[in-house]
Design a protein with these regions (language model features):
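N-terminal, polar/charged subdomain of small-to-medium soluble alpha/beta proteins
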Residues: 1-121
Length: 121
């Protein structure tokens, strides 16, 4: 994937940050493969919300900056950092797909109104 990815990892877990980084890169490459031309930059933040305590404490937030200047932010909180990355990447894919569908719908609407104006003239 040619899109630059910035990582901010704040974790008290025993998992190696490089392992998390590699996993996140792979998941994001999969989630963004169809939309890579529209992405400018990705920022991934991983952290433990509870510190060393147990419970749901692994948070992954992903910010995607699009080439048109818009930003898409998603977040996932689970008990396991790999699951947080996977869920956040899935949510990013869904949010990006919805964003692009909105753009396509508005372009179709503009074309239709332009065509209607020509027909009425």
């Amino acid at each position: 994937m040619d899109v630059p990815i910035d990582f901010v990892i704040r974790s008290a877990s025993a998992i190696d940050p490089d392992t998390l980084r590699t996993y996140a890169e792979r998941r994001l490459a999969f989630a963004l493969r169809r939309f890579e031309s529209r992405a400018r930059r990705v920022v991934v933040r991983l952290g433990d919300t509870n510190g060393p305590r147990r419970g749901i404490d692994s948070r992954c937030s992903i910010t995607l900056q699009l080439r048109n200047g818009r930003h898409i932010d998603v977040e996932a909180v689970t008990a396991w950092p790999f699951a947080s990355i996977t869920l956040a990447a899935k949510r990013l894919n869904e949010a990006l797909r919805r964003e692009l569908e909105k753009d396509q719908h508005s372009v179709r609407r503009r074309r239709r109104t332009s065509f209607d104006a020509l027909v009425e003239a």
